[in-house]
């Protein structure tokens, strides 16, 4: 068998509302989650609704580049 790129890759999900609003004095930072995705099943960017401890609500977290 040919050895190519790994099918499962590690991705970092970042809160889109924290990034959009910018890190102001009220916000202490930007929420990030680390997870894995199957490159064959989801070739596009991954977006999940996760809890952001800085926004105090569930927001959309998008995949970022490493």
From Swiss-Prot:
Its main location: plastid. Keywords: Chloroplast, Plastid, Ribonucleoprotein, Ribosomal protein. GO terms for molecular function: structural constituent of ribosome. Pfam families: Ribosomal_L33. It is found in: Plastid, Chloroplast. One of its GO terms (biological process) is translation. Disulfide bonds: none annotated. GO terms for cellular component: chloroplast; ribonucleoprotein complex; ribosome. It comes from the Eukaryota. Gene3D superfamilies: Ribosomal protein L33. PROSITE patterns: RIBOSOMAL_L33. This is Large ribosomal subunit protein bL33c. Coiled coil: none annotated. Belongs to the bacterial ribosomal protein bL33 family.
